[in-house]
Amino acid sequence: MSAAKKGMKKSTYLIIWTLVIALLCSAVGVVNYEALYWDSALTLYFGEVGVKNVSTVTFDTDDHAQVANLIVAEGAVLLKNEKNALPMKGGKISLFGIDNKSGVLQKVLEDEGFTVNPTLAAFYAASSHSSGAGSLSAGNGSETGGWVIDEVPQSEYTADVKASYKDYNDAAVVVLMRTGAEGNDLPYDMSRYGGSADENYLELNKDEKELLAEVHKAFDKVIVLISSANAMQMDFVDKAEYGIDAVLWYARPAGGIGSIAKILSGAINPSGRLVDTYVHDNMSSAAMQNFGDYRYVNEDGTLSGYSYVNYAEGIYVGYKYYETRYEDAVLKQGNAGDYDYAATVAYPFGYGLSYTDFEWSDLKVDWDGDLCTASVTVKNTGFTSGKDVVEFYVQSPYIPGGVEKAAVSLAQYVKTAELAPGESQRVSVTFSKQDIASYDAKDAKTYVIDAGDWYVTAAHDAHEAVNNVLAAKGKTTADGMTANGNTAMAAKYTVSERELLNKDAVSGAEVTNQLDDIVYADDTVYLSRSDWSVMDNNGLEYATGVAKGVSNVGNISGDAPTYVISDDLRAKFELKGFAASLNPTDPTDAPDPSRYPHHGTKPRPSS
């Protein structure tokens, strides 16, 4: 063999193996990157020893798709429907929003009989914009740059794209998308993500506002789809410059997207209800007063790497803040002030519309020992079949200085069967005193049922529940209520003396405080409905850590007290495995080991 051929053979051999090694290195790099990205989660899940997966279970993807579509069909929430904008029986529509870049929603809409603007679809598919683009940080799955909304600016819409609107103008469907998951705090300062410092991630950015304004100019019907698992700020929904006729919410449905098309067409009548309170300004929440990345500092003033914050809003999160402060404003108590509920809340917890109408009657509430059974008759009084949801709320008596209580708490709910026009169904629920008890951490140090007047009400949402209770107390719109309540949907139950629920219903074990020393900052001021003005005066400055030099740090007033981490506390932070829970009970002491299935030799403690 000539030297030239030998050289060529060696060269070819080298090229092939170089490519193989390069591909292997690339694959290892990707896997290593993902492992590093989820390092904390993987370590917690798998531990620090090897785990062998011996499962041979397979799953039917068709079954998965059916379940996903069922979840969306039952859970998507119709928030607004002016002039019966929905449903639409087919039609020629234009689909807006960078979240449509994949073409998935377009396909299911076309499968449902809609004709979707192809020029606009091609424009998004070719766009360089992509929502959520950014870099990732290692360790805990957090995204440091993934909050770029990146909607297409109006300056990039060509004349041909805009000209296509007139041929597909039965409706404009605008998709607004937000991401977010565990391990990620959504930014309330968008200056690092293409926005401004006074914008938060869950409000519309400049490009989205301009998109809605331009769409309103070109279309008589505007439908907004909100694809977000987090509660977006809803200050835009009723603004005249956007002309929004209908709003449908769904939470990143993945394989269930087909049900969205069926809801728009009317093949499915929406029956979902909100599991959050949607407000005009997300900063109105009590929990936002100290939201941030609060870090402990070492004795030398450097950051320790550990974060901590006392949740001094206490129970007043979501509807338990908004509805409770509203009731106190109506009752003129607790320094609630001139609280304007209507200007604060766009859609209350439990809210949701239907394409038909329902009428409720004959509420019955019966107590049998520790169990309560509540029932009501639901009748479809509209012109199309649909399902309704009856939510049962409870109000427990509040004693200033005692256990904090929300104005109402959801006790149970039930969804009807598919009811044809004119059809009725009697629905009922059962709940126990344990389900509605409060925990008295200071005095009784166990669950309690306080003496006084209790109310059970059937309502469409949390706000209607409060109004029903207020009506039962003799209050009307003349007292500042947003609407008159329905006394027929509220029942009073009087407890003569306080009851302690200090025995576990299953094990019989004593129920009492276990973590009295878990709060590190003893000077924490907790929010109380006895004095709402504390929050208004930025009184909830209760975060530990430093407020300067760390991204997204600071409360409403821009500062926070600083605490130095102790050696003892640092040691607790550095614990691993079961010890890291600081659980004072050894898992082997569980009263009934059969209740705690575990692959190891010790029973796993209940969560």
Give the positions of each predicted feature:
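C-terminal non-catalytic regions of proteins with extracellular/luminal or membrane-system context
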Residues: 1-607
